[in-house]
Amino acid sequence: MRILIILSIILCSFFARADLEYIDNDIYNYNGGRNENGCLEVYDPYEKFNRKVFAFNSVLDHIILRPLAVGYKNITNDYIKARVNSFVSNVYTPLTAVNYGLQLNYDKTIKSVWRFLINTTLGIGGLFDVASKVGLQSDRQTFGSTLAHYGVAPGPYLVLPIIGSTNARDMTDSVITNYAINPLMYYTHNDFDLGILAISKITDRYVVLPFSDYVMKNSTDPYVAIRSALHRTREASVQYPENFKCPKPKN
């Protein structure tokens, strides 16, 4: 059973990226201009390799992950989806607190800790987002966000077998890294941790169903469309140091 759970988590990584939660599925506006000093141009020196892996991952997504996301969409109502999203978000809040601590942003570190404590207790294990109602909003941070905070540019765009789309900097946001530095994971059973990871990937994939379906059916080049969307939305979600300038790729 544990092997099946692990395989499910791995196979749920193709399109399911937390970065995509920033995409507006209604208007398909992928302009990441909110971060004016970010790296808005994609650096893709390995495009030939990336396209081959993208095609491979797309087939597996069509066979495995997309059906799971569609099933989740069909068998759960909006209330259940909201509870699942709130619960998963709460599990990853300690990870956000750790990364804010690494960024020396102690105000947001403390707020993240309070958010976790409030939602875990008053929110019944995180099923309800009580903290947002008292001004403690969700603001997910990853180790890639922390690296960006210290001026690390995204680097080359990469599409890895099974892992999916990422870049040199955000490879640190793999399942293994986020799993390792989330303090909550050290106090819970392994099967629980794996289950949370699998559920989070399925819900992430559900969120981007309108986007991915639209691109696959209408885009003349789905690879470019998805690459642009992932890159720009990720750049819009990180905060670079003041006066940061994206380095120009070497020819």
Swiss-Prot record:
InterPro entries: MlaA. Keywords: Signal. One of its GO terms (biological process) is intermembrane phospholipid transfer. Pfam families: MlaA. One of its GO terms (cellular component) is membrane. Residues 1-18 form the signal peptide. Belongs to the MlaA family. This is Uncharacterized protein RT0044. The lineage of its organism: Bacteria, Pseudomonadati, Pseudomonadota, Alphaproteobacteria, Rickettsiales.
